[in-house]
Amino acid sequence: MLTLNKLLARGAGLAPALLKRAATVELDWDVRQKSRFDATDSQGRALGVFLPRGSVVRGGDVLVAEDGSLVRVIAAPQSVLVVRHCSEHGSAFDLLRAAYHLGNRHVPLELQPDRLQLEPDHVLADMLRAMHLIVSEAQAPFEPESGAYGEAAAHGHGHAGHDHAHDHDHGPAQASTPAPTPRGRPVGVAIKAAAPAPHVHGPGCGHDHDHGSGHHH
């Protein structure tokens, strides 16, 4: 078994010729979100992958073996639900609204300019159809969005090496001298609570409304 314990995001730093000659391995999302797994590459070799905990493998990434061998990862086609807006009964904004509701449920979700993709779930499919969205089944690679803070560092986009501290020069007068108070005049600060914004049941409303509609897409 060939042991691979290093991950290069998108083959960073490798010459195109090396990437072209590298063996490949097709992995679906269920496998690629694991840090340890077994697989078989395009040359028929058994692979044992041991990556740091929390690693996520994306299509186009390159796994590096202990002996320096390279294996390029291909996101394998798998069953997905493809969600598109219905131009007859809605608008493209419905996709944004659907992404909001799916995100609240922590559903792994792939975002594309004209569609959403998620793993098959009949309950979610019914919910999306009730929102007047078109839901269909397909075989396609699945690359869900990563967490805002989770995967970026593993793929080299973190800011751990950057110093974001801001130095402010507060002179002695600024740091220790209070502003003078006018004599003979009380000091007070009027605090007025902001009036709550009226609730508008428009396309941006986050509530689910039962329209009693029998549309089927």
Swiss-Prot record:
Compositionally biased intervals (Basic and acidic residues): 160-171, 206-217
A single GO cellular-component term on record: cytoplasm
Compartments reported by the entry: Cytoplasm
Ranges of biased composition (kind: Low complexity): 193-202
Keywords for the protein's UniProt record, in alphabetical order: Chaperone, Cytoplasm, Nickel, Nickel insertion
Family matches, as InterPro entries: UreE, UreE_C_dom, UreE_N, UreE_N_sf
SUPFAM superfamilies, per the entry: Urease metallochaperone UreE, C-terminal domain, Urease metallochaperone UreE, N-terminal domain
GO MF terms, alphabetically ordered: nickel cation binding; unfolded protein binding
Listed GO biological process terms: protein folding; protein-containing complex assembly; urea metabolic process
Disordered: region residues: 148-217
Family: Belongs to the UreE family.
Function according to Swiss-Prot or TrEMBL: Involved in urease metallocenter assembly. Binds nickel. Probably functions as a nickel donor during metallocenter assembly.
Name of this protein: Urease accessory protein UreE
